[in-house]
Amino acid sequence: MASSPKAPKSHRKFQSIYHPTRPLSLWQDNQHDQGEVRIEIIPLIDVVFCILTFFILGAVGLSRQQAISLDLPRASTGAPQMREMFMVSLDDLGQLYVEKQPVSQEQMVSALQNYHQYNPSGLIVLHASRNASYNDVVQLLDTLRTVGGDRVALATLPGDGQTPSGMNPNSFNNPNLGLPGMTPGNAFPNGANPGMSNFNNSNPGGSGAGVPNFSNTPLPGMPDANGNVSPNPGMNPGFPGGGAMSPDPNSQSPNLPGMGNTVPSAPQQ
């Protein structure tokens, strides 16, 4: 087979310079050819929730009521107040504070009047320390009530409010509380009454222990209703109804008045 004739060098150089280029094929997404723009919702939701959380925390922190650090007493019967409140604090030394700022009583009254003017239904709360003087607390409450009326409350710490197991607070006022060997209306076990025979058990409800009735029992040495005097041995004979005492003749004690004639002891040599 005969070979093709070779082109001259000049022609080959011209062909290499002006060789036509082939078009490049680029990959294109045919779905976006229509010109639609899609917004990603999930990243937008994340950003919105982050901003919302920031604003919630900022609003709660800025709107919180500020007060002095006090040792408040506890109360299990207190009810939480959710209304708008005006805080007044009283420390151990009797110093007044309004919004953590020390004020005098006149300044506090002026602040209360301004608050009551713009918030007629607002609640005035007193934060009094546990060690504050009782007189200071009462006087301050009286001052607050002159401005706020019945919208004044004491701030306390919440208590557990639980009654100990096995304890019934009404049992202390129960007259029929049963004790071993005891019955209502009798103060001694099993109805025994040592040394006393007449008890006043006429209380039908048995609300208290039996009380001895001495209305018909005369006192020793004193006349009774019939004029009789009960004997009183061993007492001073100068007393009505008293018996005579027999002193010991060998006693070294001096004569006592009202003891009768006693024989003095012979002086010792």
Swiss-Prot record:
Biased composition annotated in UniProt, kind: Low complexity: 193-204
Recorded GO CC terms: plasma membrane
Region (Disordered): 190-269
Residue ranges, Periplasmic side: 62-269
Keyword ATP-binding: no
Record keywords: Cell inner membrane, Cell membrane, Membrane, Protein transport, Transmembrane, Transmembrane helix, Transport
Subcellular location: Cell inner membrane
GO biological process, one term: protein transport
UniProt keyword annotation of Transport present: yes
Membrane topology note: Single-pass type II membrane protein
Entries under InterPro entries matching the protein: ExbD (IPR003400)
Record protein name field: Putative biopolymer transport protein ExbD
Membrane side Cytoplasmic: residue ranges: 1-40
Molecular-function GO term, any one: transmembrane transporter activity
Organism: Synechocystis sp. (strain ATCC 27184 / PCC 6803 / Kazusa)
Family per record: Belongs to the ExbD/TolR family.
